[in-house]
């Protein structure tokens, strides 16, 4: 197959979402879902592509064990839909309602799917669902997790922090950070560690963005805005130990380029860097200490509105020629996307102002991922 070693670009176009695929030879397959299955994702906003491993394939029954064989899938997610797509063929094996034990509430609004070593998670209308990929015979998402024992209303933001032992989400109803377990029926309220500058609970903040440098890290970052005074924004330096956290504030002046930024991503390698986009400018910000220090990156950016940013490192042991370390930027102009990748140097800055990677197609890019035959979530 040629569908499991290359680049997938999740995009929106004409009120639908689909994926373009580029293999390692540079060959392009447009609208993979439409071409292979005759249907696309509903929704006009492409959100995220997640990889799921050990997913029970409902079309591949093992007659000896009477169980479904496991496979690797992509979860392309829009603001209105998500599907399970077999990586080896690019074909849809489960539509959104088929991915659940019980029919999910309508209108469908996933927005986010993510995985940890323990469980595979998905959102719908801000509610959390999960299953255990290694032990689940059917790979069906559970009934929704409750906020607490009193079933208070909640709505989890699409921005996640990958802490240990549980990922950390933000409840937009109570404006509180919560741990999202893959082994119980309720979310877990975070507790404050000594020295925190902001309680994890009832923050009275809007979460504009959040992320982690890597899986199972203790250091995380967020961009937050005060609800009572929306002109006040800050970068939150978050340390998580178990289900406790401490938050330090790096307040942003209105003249700071990060104050008016529209997109953020972290460097996921060794560098303590936050990248962001302000207008048609690309910036980096050292987050090794408070306050952070900004630096404008002089690179040749694609034309049009910049709508996507992501750091994507990939290392193959003993094969440096197959490894890469890209800062990806996506733009849209006249209904067409352009995605470029800048090779980063050892300190996390573009080694060359010209991009080393380039993709172009129809639609507006929402996410980009790289896959290979033994990829895991």
Task: Locate each region found by the language model.
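Hydrophobic beta-strand positions that form the internal "hydrophobic ladder"
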Residues: 7, 73-74, 120, 167, ...
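Short coil turn/linker residues within repeat-based beta-strand modules
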Residues: 26, 89, 289-291, 344-348
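Repeat-based blade/solenoid architectures
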Residues: 41-47, 201, 255-260, 301-315, ...
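Acidic, serine/threonine- and glycine-rich low-complexity intrinsically disordered segments
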Residues: 81-296
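Loop/turn-rich, solvent-exposed surfaces of beta-rich toroidal or solenoidal domains
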Residues: 257-341
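Blade-level signature of beta-propeller repeat domains, shared across WD40, Kelch, NHL, RCC1
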Residues: 326-377
